[in-house]
């Protein structure tokens, strides 16, 4: 079996994985004032925040190119790849996952699977890494898919944002529109649910209480097993430091990965968002 893993630019990957020849990534465009940008090509993350601050309109995103994925699958076939696993931004907040399922019929020479990751960022990157590791350990394609599904089912993320407008106006928050007029008195905690949708999980009165509640939720989640934890933020280093300190003060003794949301996810969450991702160790 020669396996390729395809993901998108919302997945947080360490440098060694970005350079791995078996991993391929599709860029997701960010549109600001009718100009199209691709992070890492013609847009740095600092440029993104500056352009977002300067614009009177909220930025938008589009889906990766279907034709680019179709062409990539053809290229992989010509290079002798026999199997492909595609892991992309959660189907609950992007239509891309639903739109690509037909491609398996277009390339019958490759055995492929596009499971819904139901997540993004660091947890998505963890899935990509694990799939590659399992393949190189000699696991069969079906065994990899079974283990991957277990990881998907036990992975989640909880989020606190400064401004719900980005999520609601972008159509990425399933049950948040009723909160828009009430943000002065509450600080909602959001989560990725079982369908990969971002939903309101709890309403907390202040940011400090919400941060403490995030730690309580995390400790409850990891009580029944071994998990990798990541703190993820969009230009909110002070909040990330505070959340890490609260975690350590609560008795959490494991390594905590800290990463930044890329431009695509920051488009939907806005500046100042803080989150933690939880992924099982399998």
Curated annotation (Swiss-Prot):
Residues 3-280 form the DegV domain. It holds the Pfam family DegV. The keyword Transcription does not apply. The keyword Membrane does not apply. GO terms for molecular function: lipid binding. Keywords: Lipid-binding. Hexadecanoate binds at residues 61, 94. It comes from the Bacteria. NCBIfam families: DegV. May bind long-chain fatty acids, such as palmitate, and may play a role in lipid transport or fatty acid metabolism. This is DegV domain-containing protein M6_Spy0690. It comes from Streptococcus pyogenes serotype M6 (strain ATCC BAA-946 / MGAS10394).
